[in-house]
Amino acid sequence: MSETRAVLRGVRLSVDKGRLVADLIRGKKVDQALNVLQFTQKKAAVIIKKVLESAIANAEHNDGADIDELKVKTIYVEQGATLKRFTARAKGRGNRISKPTCHVYVTVGN
């Protein structure tokens, strides 16, 4: 039983929004997971789909795995660094804008 993983770090996406999509495909077969992501209208779905496709390609190339038997073993989204920016407000003030990033980890296996 081999497991292969793919990682995407520093994605410009909120952790909560990424976890919503990750919960949809956890434990599913990879073809079913790709189908779910194809029809999920979220920015996170496009990002996670690319990471899942990378994990599938890694499993096929590095381990010689059969794609039809692969399942999404683990998928999790962790918080990354937050970019802090300022925007101008009235009367010479400024407000902070947080631009969160996250890291996406996908593991596929039999």
From Swiss-Prot:
Recorded GO CC terms: cytosolic large ribosomal subunit
Pfam families found in the cross-reference section: Ribosomal_L22
An individual GO BP term: translation
Protein's UniProt keywords contain RNA-binding: yes
Membrane-spanning ranges: none
Gene3D superfamilies assigned to the protein according to its UniProt record, in alphabetical order: Ribosomal protein L22/L17
Matches recorded under InterPro entries: Ribosomal_uL22 (IPR001063), Ribosomal_uL22_bac/chlpt-type (IPR005727), Ribosomal_uL22_bac/org-type (IPR047867), Ribosomal_uL22_CS (IPR018260), Ribosomal_uL22_sf (IPR036394)
UniProt KW keywords: Ribonucleoprotein, Ribosomal protein, RNA-binding, rRNA-binding
Keyword Nucleus on entry: no
Gene Ontology MF terms: rRNA binding; structural constituent of ribosome
Protein family per UniProt: Belongs to the universal ribosomal protein uL22 family.
Protein's job: This protein binds specifically to 23S rRNA; its binding is stimulated by other ribosomal proteins, e.g. L4, L17, and L20. It is important during the early stages of 50S assembly. It makes multiple contacts with different domains of the 23S rRNA in the assembled 50S subunit and ribosome. The globular domain of the protein is located near the polypeptide exit tunnel on the outside of the subunit, while an extended beta-hairpin is found that lines the wall of the exit tunnel in the center of the 70S ribosome.
Subunit architecture: Part of the 50S ribosomal subunit.
Protein name according to UniProt: Large ribosomal subunit protein uL22
Organism name: Variovorax paradoxus (strain S110)
Gene this protein is translated from: rplV
